[in-house]
């Protein structure tokens, strides 16, 4: 078990892609389980986590329950942000469909694990209105999220977080910037 305190990249077992998690909102209780060369995020131990998704289902809103890679989570907040793909290291091919867009827009989802929320329901919440709100959230349909902004990096033996960061930088340093215009109709990809 490793305790993550900085930028962390988690390869998922299904497709061995890596989800990049925002460093600022990683709690100290983020734990990775070692399964061969794969590291899987255990959302039960995570206080909150932010993921970036591409084209978001309009049903996914604050308070919704979502299923991501087989993990049920509760959406605490949603923030739309425009990214410079070159700086972030996301692949341009991920956004080839959105050619008309000024810049590829990713949506940041701030999530809490459903199990943690159930614990909160039992112990901490004394406000009856808040309890009712949580109960309606649990009764809602769980929406599955497929399109996560991922880095398809080949699996590697990971010794530490700094090595992961170096690998990402090596991989994406040579990504060219395209669509730079003076008018700014397409912006920097």
From Swiss-Prot:
Name of the featured protein: Uncharacterized protein YNL140C
Originating organism: Saccharomyces cerevisiae (strain ATCC 204508 / S288c) (Baker's yeast)
Protein origin, superkingdom: Eukaryota
Note: Present with 1590 molecules/cell in log phase SD medium.
